[in-house]
Amino acid sequence: MTTMSNLPAEVLEEILSRTPVTSLRTMRSTCKKWNNLSKKKIIPEAARKQQGLMLIKKKICSLSFSLHEIHKDDYVVPCINQVDIPRNIEVEKIFHCDGILLCVIEDNCSLLVWNPYLGQTRRIEVSSDADMNDRYALGYDNNNSSHKILRIKKDFKNSDGLGYEIYRFASNSWSLLDEEVMKPEWDVWSVQRSSVSLKGNTYFLLQGNDYDDQEDEEEEDDEEYEDDDDVLPKDNFLLCFDYTTERFGPRLLLPFNPHVEETVALSCIGEERLVMLYQSFKTYKGIEIWVTDKIDPKAVSWSKFLKVDITPLTGFPVDFYADSFVIDEEKKVAAVFDIHCSYQKAHIIGEDGYLKCVNMGRASDVGNGQPLVFSSYVPSLVKVPVKQPKGKRKGRSSETKSNKNKKGRKIKIIG
């Protein structure tokens, strides 16, 4: 008699491949064979695919749909699943790095660090003066792989009105960062969702208005914008926070020169490369997507992935404004998320132009009418750093030990 535990490997792989990665923890506990297969087969394959996380009414949900069949006439059905978060906690904001999620919870007063695949969690209290506008980011020290959390808050005692704090998992403590060392000469309060953690560092996208409102100067700016691709308005750039040095790096050039009213969005491919979307209104109505060839805290280079002129496209919404997005490198297509006519939608574009629209449901049912924030996510075997007794330090580690006593274990909030 065939049972779940002795199914052929190809059948198991098919079942696991159709299971949301954030739900695999439950399936791993079914038997040792499923656990090993999910590690050796599913995690490496998931790293090559674009998956996503989003917040729906303060709940974390996984989002996936195949872009491989978009050239066919079949209706593309998105798969949205609520992730089983411990204790049914409500989440205000979500960030991630290295497969680990950083969740802002309880009216922004606490943080939950969580690996959904391993089912490991750790709770961290915010040091003081928690505010809904505080900015957070997660990364790690590349020298010893120890994770850290960056917090940027209002602090009017400092010259720029901002305070910078770092939480070091190795010491279980928050500490203030030196204002003069940290001051990056930019208005961090203009940053909302425009940050991505990559290779242990966090990259912030900064946009500002560097143009005069007078008509003659606008025309001069337009001419420069059209004719010189190398000119960079000073308030449009990337800035990297390096968790190893605990400092901001120099300004990194964008591959285009956006005006303040144009749309720029930031995403990533796995844990290796940044992806940037630019929706132009000035010189032409179109969308460009760029991918990094090289990226580190002090240097970046770009290649154009896709360019689509949306003016002549049949069916493309007139009032379309790009927000979050995801790309499929193999098929050379992108899904760009937007709210249109009270519905949350994913617009699929490619080299052939506008391909199709995927209906994600009424906006009131997904985020209370707010733009759908899609965050590219790759699961990992990186453990959540446990709270260490004084005198002990422990860095980031993979799940290399045996899974002894893990079968059927309950989730515990540590720390």
UniProtKB/Swiss-Prot annotation:
Segments for region (Disordered): 209-229, 387-415
Alphabetized InterPro entries for the sequence: F-box-assoc_dom_typ1, F-box-assoc_interact_dom, F-box-like_dom_sf, F-box_dom, SCF_F-box_component
Biased composition range(s): Acidic residues: 210-229
Annotated transmembrane regions: none
Record-annotated F-box domain positions: 1-50
Biased composition (Basic residues): 403-415
Gene3D superfamilies listed in its UniProt record: 1.20.1280.50
Name the record gives this protein: F-box protein At3g13820
The organism of origin for this protein: Arabidopsis thaliana
